[in-house]
């Protein structure tokens, strides 16, 4: 007959398996992770209709090397409700000075480089302290070669300049970049033909007006520069071998 009496002398053995015990922190983190994943799935489902639309990327931030060439820095006075011409691209002497600096001093072009795009960048800063206004800008790319732009125009449907006070224009024509090779030989043979036939055949000549939304006459410091987007081709084989290269 079995003995059901309680006696502490009778030993009992218990086997504990670790698979039934989990870290409390891991349990809470896993629950939060599952909740976050479920919320993320719901949020993505609400954005699925946007897959039918396309967004244009900024070519300025694309692949390639940016080479900046500052054209000029000067101060302009702009009256209220008007915009002043700051870039007109007229005169061969302006071309000569600009592109001589571009070729010889500040732009190391070699034959295996390709100019993909040219950006005109206008940086605007107020010269007087404690002024609160926004900059306005308008530009044109396609115009008659004989067109003479006005120095001052009225403000009609302008573009607001961003928070960094920088107005950037891509001068590339529709259809892609500018496959220019052997730039040194083209430039040395005839400078005028190089500008007219090589550069302006592939890029637009811009006309840019700058203004403000201020009710008073404002003094603006302008920095106008060209930024060249250069494509560099990787060599087929390295020129040097060894741990230093």
Curated annotation (Swiss-Prot):
Keyword line: Host nucleus, Viral occlusion body
Claim: Acyltransferase is one of the keywords in the record: no
Protein known as: Polyhedrin
InterPro entries in UniProt: Polyhedrin
Predominant location: host cell
Locations listed in the record: Host nucleus
Entry GO terms, CC: host cell nuclear matrix; viral occlusion body
Family of this protein: Belongs to the polyhedrin family.
Any one GO molecular function term: structural molecule activity
Organism: Autographa californica nuclear polyhedrosis virus
General function of this protein: Major component of the virus occlusion bodies which are large proteinaceous structures termed polyhedra. These structures serve as the protective package for the virus particles outside the infected host and allow natural transmission of virus between insect hosts, assisting persistence in the environment. Forms the paracrystalline lattice of polyhedra and interacts with enveloped virions as well as other accessory molecules and structures to form a mature viral occlusion body.
Residues covered by region (Nuclear localization signal): 32-35
